[in-house]
Amino acid sequence: MEYNTSALCDIYLDQVDVVEPMFSNFGGCASFAGQITTIKCYEDNGLIRETLEQDGLGRILLIDGGGSLRRALIDAELAALAEENEWEGIVVYGSVREVDELEEMSIGIQAIASIPVGATSQGIGEVDIPVNFGGVTFLPEDYLYADNTGIIISQEPLSADLGEEEEDELL
């Protein structure tokens, strides 16, 4: 399904938080949405792997990597694992690598930057805790909507199906 964060903001602006514009799209799906599972880790992707091994249908993995530009938390192997387990997308407050392979995958991936250096895999970090970056506090189970324009979150699901009347009002 396609999501348009601009249209969603036009309708639901008082119900959503808008993440500061710092992310770029690295995955094969330009838009994605779902309930978030949070991970807080720094230059270590062990917990990320454990989480992506779970069923991700309807879910987005939101990773607070401390904004690190030194090591990539997501690579092609982890993205393939996410795709295999039906995750809707991954948002990384940090870096990714193997970007040519990532853009061929049927999963949404947004991150700050890319770097060829991989992360360690010791499993250090925390899962399903509130995290804060981009001017927004993300709570486990919040709903996240992302496209090439930006990322927004809501405590409640938003209708992506705009009726004709609503579409006419937006024009």
Curated annotation (Swiss-Prot):
GO terms, biological process: regulation of RNA metabolic process
Entries under Pfam families matching the protein: RraA-like
Subcellular locations according to the entry: Cytoplasm
Cytoplasm as UniProt keyword: yes
SUPFAM superfamilies: RraA-like
One function term, GO molecular function aspect: enzyme binding
A cellular component annotation (GO) from this entry: cytoplasm
Main localisation: cytoplasm
Membership in a protein family: Belongs to the RraA family.
Oligomeric and partner information: Homotrimer. Binds to both RNA-binding sites in the C-terminal region of Rne and to RhlB.
Function comment: Globally modulates RNA abundance by binding to RNase E (Rne) and regulating its endonucleolytic activity. Can modulate Rne action in a substrate-dependent manner by altering the composition of the degradosome. Modulates RNA-binding and helicase activities of the degradosome.
Protein name: Regulator of ribonuclease activity A
GN (gene name): rraA
